[in-house]
């Protein structure tokens, strides 16, 4: 049995499927894909994933893409040390929260990430080179996001994204008043999902929102997450991000 995991820095999508691999104690080959060099759009990588997106799981030559799909695949193939409830009701609750994170959290956090971080990269590239790079991006939506990052997101788009993020953290805060973890009293993929996209860094991303005062249960939950050995190991993974882009402070520095 051979597992290869193609990924970027230990954050967001790449972190979301790396944590389950480690939680389950699965040996895997880590293959770093340098997004800053646009390796995800290089011929060798597009041959693996025609969408030009990380992460990718290669299980004995079978290619699995998209983090929620990868994580469910790991549960099906490697059920030991489960991260999905065994009972149908518990699994349904976990999937509800995963759907919420994928559709209502990730997209809006991503807008701020592209605005504050990717825009710096996009604007640093000469116009001719930028146009050449855009031609190598397989997905139209990704090309659109790169162009938006270069030209800048509108204040209305950013305000709407912030509003949706506030709704999400408030929703999780209310849930944590009822259960120990997001999908119930078990630690599940739903916790990993929200942590990877938002929970691990929402305070640093939006210091002006005073999340610590607004959502104390969320902060306690985040500390439980960060203290998990598998999470700590995943976060210690390779990070080639330029130092000036690593810290979310409400400003791009």
Q: Which residue ranges define each predicted feature?
A:
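Short beta-strand segments
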Residues: 6-7, 193-196, 236
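Positions that flank functional sites
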Residues: 35-36, 187, 240-241
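The C-terminal cap of the DNA-recognition helix in HTH/winged-HTH DNA-binding domains
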Residues: 79, 177-178, 227
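Long, positively charged, glycine-interspersed low-complexity recognition regions
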Residues: 212-253
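Residue-level signal for nonpolar/aromatic packing positions in well-ordered secondary structure
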Residues: 57, 94, 172, 191, ...
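GST-like domain detector, emphasizing the conserved glutathione-binding G-site
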Residues: 1-138, 249-252
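GST-like fold's C-terminal all-alpha helical module
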Residues: 103-223
């Amino acid at each position: 049995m051979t597992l290869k995991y193609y990924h970027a820095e230990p954050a967001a999508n790449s972190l979301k499927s790396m944590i389950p691999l480690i939680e389950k104690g699965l040996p895997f080959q880590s293959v770093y894909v340098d997004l800053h060099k646009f390796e995800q759009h290089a011929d060798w990588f597009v041959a693996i994933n025609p969408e030009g997106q990380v992460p990718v799981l290669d299980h004995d030559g079978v290619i699995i893409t998209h983090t929620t799909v990868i994580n469910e695949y790991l549960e099906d193939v490697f059920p030991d040390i489960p991260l999905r409830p065994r009972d149908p009701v518990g699994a349904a609750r976990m999937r509800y929260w995963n759907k919420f994170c994928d559709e209502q959290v990730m997209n809006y956090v991503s807008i701020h990430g592209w605005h504050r971080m990717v825009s710096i990269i996009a604007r640093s590239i000469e116009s001719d080179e930028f146009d050449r790079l855009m031609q190598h991006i397989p997905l139209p939506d990704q090309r659109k996001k790169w162009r938006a990052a270069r030209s800048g997101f509108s204040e209305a788009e950013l305000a709407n994204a912030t509003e949706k993020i506030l709704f999400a953290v408030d929703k999780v805060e209310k849930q944590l008043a009822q259960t120990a973890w997001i999908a119930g009293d078990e630690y599940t993929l739903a916790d990993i999902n929200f942590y990877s996209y938002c929970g691990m860094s929402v305070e640093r991303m939006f210091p002006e929102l005073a999340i610590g005062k607004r959502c104390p249960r969320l902060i306690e939950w985040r500390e439980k997450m960060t203290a998990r050995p598998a999470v700590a190991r995943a976060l210690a993974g390779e990070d080639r991000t330029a130092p000036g882009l690593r810290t979310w402070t409400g400003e791009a520095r």
